[in-house]
Amino acid sequence: MIESSEVFDAVRRGYNEFEAASNSEILDYFSSIDGDAVAGHASHIKGILFEQEYVDLLSAQGVEAQIFEATNHPVTDVAIMDGDNIVQEVQLKATDSSSYISAAIEENPDVGIVATSEVAASFDGDMVIDSGIEDAALEQAVSETVLEEAVNPVSPLSVIGWMFGLPF
């Protein structure tokens, strides 16, 4: 289970203006965002949360890895380390869209992709690695922690989300 503190850490990492913000300040901001912006924020936070969760998972398995400092690092998201040396860089994709993964492979055919479990299962070979982390769990953690006020089951935005297949 993904803890709410991990979601708040992802927000602080992904938004410079929240680097020193309290949980309450973060919640206040997201409770007042425009409904059109919710999906973009959810995707951004989910991607950063996925990076954190994957590095933690590797660490628990005795594999040293690090997230690049910049959240917009070109092409790759995580470096697999051997001491001070980077032995491999991988791109992470928190999605349930196989076409999104296919496009990433086409754009960067020499870069391995680590994907959420739902979509990784639809690929054969070594290019897409199953992270062992479910996209649905990431979406749920983000929506329940920081977007619950922005989107609730009876709000007009939730109805729009259901119509367009958004996870809220």
Predicted features, each with a name:
Residues 1-46:
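Interdomain/boundary linker segments immediately adjacent to catalytic/signaling cores
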Residues 3, 22, 97, 116-117, ...:
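Helix N-terminus capping/helix-initiation residues
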Residues 4-8, 102, 126:
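Intrinsically disordered, low-complexity regions
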Residues 6-10, 65, 113:
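Generic preference for hydrophobic/aromatic residues in regular secondary structure cores
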Residues 26-29, 36-106:
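Catalytic centers of nucleases
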Residues 107-153:
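Extended, hydrophilic extramembrane loops/domains of integral membrane proteins
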Residues 153-168:
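Short, glycine/alanine-rich hydrophobic alpha-helices that insert into or span membranes
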